[in-house]
Amino acid sequence: MGFQIFNFEDNSNVSVVSHKGIFKVIQYDKDLSCTADDAQMKFYMSQMNVKKRQLMITLNGESVNIQPGAMQWYVGDVHQSTGLKGIGDTIKKFFNAQVTGESTIKPQYEGTGVIVTEPSYKHYIIEDLDDWNGAMCVEDGLYCASETKVNLSTSMIKSVSGQTIGDEGLFNLCLKGSGKVVLECNVPQEELITIDLHNDTLKIDGSFAIAWSENLDFTVERSGKTLIGSAMSGEGLVNVYRGTGRVLILSLIHI
């Protein structure tokens, strides 16, 4: 038994734009299946980096969780399961899904083979949790895949201001452990700013943070020391992250 894959990674129209561990991001440089009617539009799309991408996962005895509905095809001795560990785990993950809007019950694949996700115009961002103090919270809808040694749970905003007037949501999906995770984002890695805090403070005017270390304290505060100062600055309320950890923020667009 065995398999070989042709005209995929070795395709002259395909580029590997990112590769970490078992995860590899495949990008189609041009849409060669376009018609005469949409050729001009597809040309300008490719010039502006609007290209189809797929996440390729190579398993050699490892296991991985993938967002439901994301898998397009897989080959090899790969087995799929729900990854649930009894009724208690099922109830816990069902509750987490209700409060975050993000299902924590992800299809689990393990074995030896290759898995490829559905094509997407979005960008795949591969992050290592070792760079996030072992735990990162992410905005809803960004999760794509992770190694199964990464635990998916919910994290509740601790501060009253963050719960009541913050725009990050009351609960967020939290990824904990040691391993790599993949986020599906509207912007490429080149337009994401990484800020490492060392017992310091980051203030952001708006929902530009897409991921942050769980141990950071999140609050919503006035931009100035007084109401008049905040009004004069025109900034009003800002999202504040304090402590030691990492924040990943968008530089050009709003969530």
Feature locations, PLM:
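Conserved small/polar residues in nucleotide/adenosyl-binding loops
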Residues: 253-255
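N-terminal, charged/glycine-rich beta-strand/loop interface patches
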Residues: 2-172, 176-178, 186-207, 212-219, ...
